[in-house]
Swiss-Prot record:
Cofactor binding annotation: Binds 1 NAD(+) per subunit.
Keywords on record: Cytoplasm, Hydrolase, NAD, One-carbon metabolism
Coiled coil, from the record: none
Location(s) in or outside the cell: Cytoplasm
GO cellular component, one term: cytosol
Residues binding NAD(+), per UniProt: 193-195, 227, 256-261, 279, 314, 335-337, 380
GO molecular function: adenosylhomocysteinase activity
Higher taxonomy: Bacteria, Pseudomonadati, Pseudomonadota, Alphaproteobacteria, Hyphomicrobiales
Pfam families: AdoHcyase, AdoHcyase_NAD
Listed pathway(s): Amino-acid biosynthesis; L-homocysteine biosynthesis; L-homocysteine from S-adenosyl-L-homocysteine: step 1/1
Family stated for the protein in its record: Belongs to the adenosylhomocysteinase family.
Protein name: Adenosylhomocysteinase
EC identifiers of the protein: 3.13.2.1
Length: 466
């Protein structure tokens, strides 16, 4: 990066390729294009300085350009070291938006880039965060706590935490007071995924959330579509691109049966695999059983299954003792947000053979091998290109509406975690119906009165489960 070049991408020469794919994606993202049409003239995000930490894909490029069209200034990094699509990053950088994202970046680079998305050229600060997984939010809040004298940077629990702490210490030394200034300027954060939402609720419970947050993940048009239908298409895509293994007839184990697990099980089942599910929640376990899947304990199938996928958002779901017992050439991957669902750190002292980017063959002392995809990180983005544009349009439309809500009405919110109101959820769904040729039935005034709703909605109570 030169002194005048405010971006870091793999190859700026890929910008034209990226621009062509962005143009195609726009035709598949009716929600975002409708947001541009509705809000483009009024520019409700004028004055917003958005720090974005979310997978730098073609679909995210359409989101970024929608935010810019609505008046925002944006700085962007990926929220995963393997998920960037380099041509997408190049196209956004070439358009003048600062982006710091390279597929296969190191952890040190990842946290450096997270720092850079808060570094505005004029020395100013961000006033909004758009997050996926919570790393950008956590970076600022941990740094501010360290500035306040809390002893929180001394005992890292992992390699990544060690690198994160080092980056925070570097910034503390270079610019004292920087984290506190950043934190105090933030009007709000909108969070994309389950893992990041869990972090926000934990902060709220401890009284450590210093600004309002909108939980985009639990909008129905995100969790029941992106998490389920997105995974249904992208999981098998990632496994196929990574391994070229035929899934028909194979035994696949899906760890977790939440929305992501449901989509993942459907993905593998649709490819012809015989799917088994592990679950800790009796309700989800019963759902899996009644959907036709055998609900098992991992220990009972670990030596016989062919494919293992984690979807839980928890840690140590597949441990070293499980992988040691797997059959030769078992495939192991994760589609939850972070890389600690699989105990990858416990594999580091074994023999690794890199087959190709994001595909590693790991050999145990007894001679059995496993194929590990994306080093235990999101395989659908590491080994493939993530969810299709159409389903991401629904998720990202929620993000745009949430950013507008907090930026324009932030003072009306307490420092708590909120979800978007039902009418906006229904609006996002409505924006995507025409693309699929779907036509809504309309209630008569008498029918609406009979069930106690307005003719144009919302049609369900807040407690309704879709």
């Amino acid at each position: 990066m030169s002194a005048t070049q405010d971006y870091i991408v793999a190859d700026i020469g890929l910008a034209d390729f990226g621009r062509k794919e962005i143009a195609i994606a726009e035709t598949e993202m009716p929600g975002l294009m409708a947001c541009r049409e509705e809000f483009g003239a009024s520019k409700p995000l004028k004055g917003a300085r958005i720090t974005g930490s979310l997978h730098m894909t073609i679909q995210t490029a359409v989101l970024i350009e929608t935010l810019v069209a609505l008046g925002a200034e944006v700085r962007w990094a990926s929220c995963n070291i393997f998920s960037t699509q380099d041509h997408a990053a190049a196209a956004i950088a070439a358009s003048g938006v600062p982006v710091f994202a390279v597929k296969g970046e190191t952890l040190e680079e990842y946290w450096t880039y997270t720092d850079k998305i808060f570094q505005w050229a004029d020395g100013g600060v961000s006033n909004m965060i758009l997050d996926d997984g919570g790393d950008a939010t956590m970076y600022i809040l941990l740094g501010a706590r360290a500035e306040a004298g809390e002893n929180i940077l001394t005992n890292p629990g992992s390699e990544e935490e060690e690198i994160l702490f080092a980056q925070i210490k570097k910034r503390l030394a270079a610019t004292p007071g920087w984290f506190t200034r950043q934190r105090d300027a933030i009007k709000g954060v909108t969070e994309e995924t389950t893992t990041g939402v869990n972090r926000l609720y934990q902060l709220q419970a401890k009284g450590l959330l210093p600004f309002p947050a909108i939980n985009v993940n639990d909008s129905v048009t995100k969790s029941k579509f992106d998490n389920k239908y997105g995974c249904k298409e992208s999981l098998v895509d990632g496994i196929r691109r990574g391994t070229d293994v035929m899934m028909a007839g194979k035994v696949a184990v899906v760890c977790g049966y939440g929305d992501v697990g449901k989509g993942s099980a459907a993905s593998l089942s649709g490819a012809g695999a015989r799917v088994k599910v592990t679950e800790v929640d009796p309700i989800c376990a019963l759902q899996a059983a009644m959907d036709g899947y055998e609900v098992v304990q991992l220990e009972d199938v670990v030596s016989s299954a062919d494919i293992f996928i984690t979807t839980t958002g928890n840690k140590d779901v597949i441990r070293i003792e499980h992988m040691r017992a797997m059959k030769d050439m078992a495939i192991v991957g994760n589609i939850g947000h972070f890389d600690n669902e699989i105990q990858v750190s416990a594999l580091r002292n074994l023999k690794w053979t890199n087959v190709k980017p994001q595909v590693d063959l790991i050999e145990f002392p007894k001679g059995n091998r496993i194929i590990l995809l994306s080093e235990g990180r999101l395989l659908n983005l590491g080994n493939a290109t993530g969810h299709p544009s159409f389903v991401m349009s629904a998720s990202f439309s929620n993000q745009v509406l949430a950013q507008i809500e907090l930026f324009t009405k932030g003072e009306q919110y307490k420092n708590e975690v909120y979800v978007l109101p039902k009418q906006l959820d229904e609006k996002v769904a409505r924006l995507h119906l025409a693309k699929l040729g779907a036509k809504l039935t309309e209630l008569s005034e008498e029918q609406a009165s009979y069930i106690g709703v307005k003719q144009q909605g919302p049609f369900k109570a807040e407690h309704y489960r879709y």
